[in-house]
């Protein structure tokens, strides 16, 4: 965060693809005939056996704008969950989230907030990671009043929490390490990992730890605005920096957009063989959104769907990185804006994206959100348009696909803080209407939907989910088109 988070610390006035190493692996439109053949084979299989989806059970209500909870932390749930870092404790099997010190309507207590869950759906506030707040050495350097964007990793039996401290608009920042023998703390200060001052090329906040596949070597990716995102080698034994300096630059944006990139997070996917660098673009109070690049090496270069490196500052700054999630609004339902500063969990092959967001027009109410993350056939992460409620990937019978859908395309440049949905029609005869243009659709495999309109091919994953806006079950779509734009959709069960 750069960090306009200062706004949240004040009492509220009103509580109301690839380069030489990685080329675009997406199928071209010339593959349509082959895909149709596969679809026809699926038709025959479906005629023999019909499999109905299993939808998740009704989850607890979100209970947004709960002013009664402001001074009762046991009622917070996902409220105040800002810059969330997800972690599953292998010892207990419980899920934890560590987040920035934010409290709606009051000055936040410093110490890094901890939340706990058994199912990734219901969350309880545990307390603060550091009982004594900001360590004296860190306070003296940064003059910080709260802790930002903590991240955690377990090394042997030691839980290591990497915390950031700074003030809004300043490079006088530090990332420090605190350790504990429990994921719930208390965490004790060990030392500074990296610190920055005015004029340095990077800003020492927003840390994330990643382990190199094969070697076990730890790295820390970090940075916010200025010259962007760096990756620094970490001493596996101490958890502190293993090299002098600030590390290597792996992502940045030009000054024309204020260098607005932060919240880096890297995870490796064994199935694809790529490391994925997730970053947030824009302002956390308005156009904040999540993009991704990938690399065969943990230290980069990271490239997008079209092969552009995330360090490229010559190209249009809104055309670098695959935009996987941003502000959105389905029909007349509550919109969500400023989705960003995410973390990622691989839970035994089930993937999840965890981030914060704000209800449209209510920037003073941040909430943590958990969404299911799936993968395209060519290895790009796709995020569910709905909050996680326990849904599972499963075989989808094509007989339940036809109908009216609300569809959102995540355009590179947003004209407003949310992208509104539009109607599309998937007809029983396997034709469709999108933007008044006729196309066709078919099923590929157990749960993949292909839509062809003109020279654009859209490939989706279908997930039987809970519709949080309409409070019912439905089919949701998350996909990417042949130009690298991500698209969301959900079936409108009140219509056709």
Question: Each predicted region: which residue ranges?
Answer:
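Sec-dependent signal peptide recognition
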Residues: 2-8
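C-terminal motif of bacterial Sec signal peptides marking the signal peptidase cleavage site
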Residues: 15-17
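Carbohydrate-active catalytic/glycan-binding domains of CAZyme proteins
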Residues: 20-496
